[in-house]
């Protein structure tokens, strides 16, 4: 199982962070020798820079206590190669935090979730002989700092019988020893000095993230690495306005081949890239002709819809191209005068012809009609005359037949 930790943790130098501020003095845990218990926490007085996680009333005897917000929770079944007394632990996490208090119900549930013989044991100074024998295997890890000593959260690979004994007693011992120490020591694996790192979180960040301790502990234990990607660290989300603008401008969104930018004057169906077709797009080639854009457009027909523009393009392609003039066409005054005289003569002749047509039609001469009205009346009159001519020809033919019959009768008599 791969190791993972809380998503928003940053490496911090060795510092003393009190867990709570006691209203009344409590009895300290029985002290042991330095050789048997190297985890005896150092007494650090409470100062104005303390970060109380809860009220003093919630830390009475018989009540459960939650782990601090800035602790690491590694997987239960992770194998550790440094269980000897001489080798120092090689921390794979970027940050190593120490824990002084732990809740017994939370530890019991966490051991059930692990589902194997190796569980997550809190190694604390033992108080009786039974606890010291059970947890003697976990007291060989050397100190991480020469100035501050604290109880370290270390995994255990003992059998199931010794795990149950050490876990139940060590949690109760941790509760009693935390009443005397009231501190949590955070140690950086890179350096044990007190020099602050450049990315060290401020005190306000600890105050903001210290309230939801139980939720953070449960998420760090039960979340998988895939689920932890949803929890974005605070430093990635709290950008300033200028930094976010630079980040967005440096990484522009990638547009797909199907996305086109449209200009303000063009209709929606026209892409800005007129010569680009959808043949190179990852769609079905058999359907590409339906969405293919026209190859070329003229500036005059740019705002015409696709169907009408296609029709105009086909029609105008049949018209031969007119040769362009080398210069503007100019006429001399004589040509202008002759053109005006010819235009006046033509209009006069047309007016006279329409007047003759109006006289030929059986219309009232006093009514004023337009040229369109005169032509319409003339067409109707011509059709009427044709029908009358056909009727007259039929009548004349019938009269001729009657005359022939009358002649034959007169000859026979």
From Swiss-Prot:
MF GO annotations: DNA-binding transcription activator activity, RNA polymerase II-specific; protein dimerization activity; RNA polymerase II cis-regulatory region sequence-specific DNA binding
Subcellular location as annotated: Nucleus
GO cellular component, one term: nucleus
Residue span, bHLH domain: 334-385
Record GO biological process: cell differentiation; induction of conjugation upon carbon starvation; positive regulation of transcription by RNA polymerase II
Biased composition (Polar residues): 1-22, 43-63, 127-136
Location of the region described as Disordered in the Swiss-Prot/TrEMBL record: 1-202, 230-265
Superkingdom of this protein's organism: Eukaryota
Record key words, sorted: Differentiation, DNA-binding, Nucleus
Gene3D superfamilies: Helix-loop-helix DNA-binding domain
Low complexity composition-biased segments: 23-42, 86-103, 116-126, 150-197
Function: Involved in the sexual differentiation process. Modulate the ability of the cell to differentiate in response to the nitrogen starvation signal; in particular in response to decreases in the level of cellular cAMP.
Quaternary structure, from the entry: Efficient DNA binding requires dimerization with another bHLH protein.
Protein name (database record): Protein esc1
Lineage: Eukaryota, Fungi, Dikarya, Ascomycota, Taphrinomycotina
Gene that produces this protein: esc1
């Amino acid at each position: 199982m791969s190791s993972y930790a809380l998503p928003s943790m940053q490496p911090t130098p060795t510092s003393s962070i009190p867990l709570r501020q006691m209203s009344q003095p409590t009895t300290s845990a029985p002290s042991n020798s330095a050789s048997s218990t190297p985890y005896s926490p150092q007494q650090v007085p409470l100062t104005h820079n303390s970060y109380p996680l809860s009220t003093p009333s919630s830390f009475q005897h018989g009540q459960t206590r939650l782990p601090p917000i800035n602790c690491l929770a590694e997987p239960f079944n992770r194998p550790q190669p440094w269980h000897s007394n001489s080798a120092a632990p090689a921390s794979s996490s970027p940050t190593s935090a120490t824990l002084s208090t732990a809740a017994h119900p939370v530890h019991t549930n966490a051991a059930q979730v692990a589902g194997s013989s190796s569980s997550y044991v809190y190694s604390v100074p033992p108080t009786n002989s039974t606890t010291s024998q059970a947890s003697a295997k976990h007291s060989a890890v050397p100190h991480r700092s020469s100035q501050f000593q604290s109880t370290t959260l270390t995994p255990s690979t003992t059998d199931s019988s010794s795990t149950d004994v050490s876990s139940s007693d060590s949690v109760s011992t941790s509760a009693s020893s935390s009443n005397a120490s009231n501190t949590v020591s955070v140690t950086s694996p890179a350096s044990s000095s007190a020099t602050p790192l450049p990315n060290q979180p401020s005190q306000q960040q600890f105050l903001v993230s210290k309230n939801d301790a139980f939720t953070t502990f449960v998420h760090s234990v039960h979340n998988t690495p895939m689920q932890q990607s949803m929890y974005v660290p605070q430093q990635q989300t709290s950008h300033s306005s200028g930094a976010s603008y630079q980040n967005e401008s440096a990484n522009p969104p990638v547009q797909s081949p199907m996305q086109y930018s449209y200009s303000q004057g063009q209709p929606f169906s026209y892409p800005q890239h007129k010569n680009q077709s959808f043949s190179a797009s990852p769609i079905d080639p058999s359907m590409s002709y339906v969405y293919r854009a026209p190859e070329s457009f003229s500036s005059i027909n740019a705002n015409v819809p696709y169907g009408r523009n296609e029709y105009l393009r086909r029609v105008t392609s049949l018209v031969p191209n007119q040769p362009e003039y080398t210069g503007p066409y100019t006429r001399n005054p004589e040509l202008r005068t002759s053109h005006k005289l010819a235009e006046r003569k033509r209009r006069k002749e047309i007016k006279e012809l329409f007047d003759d047509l109006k006289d030929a039609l059986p219309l009232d001469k006093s009514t004023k009609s337009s040229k369109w009205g005169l032509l319409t009346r003339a067409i109707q009159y011509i059709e009427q005359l044709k029908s009358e001519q056909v009727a007259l020809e039929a009548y004349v033919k019938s009269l001729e037949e009657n005359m022939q019959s009358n002649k034959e009768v007169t000859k026979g008599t």
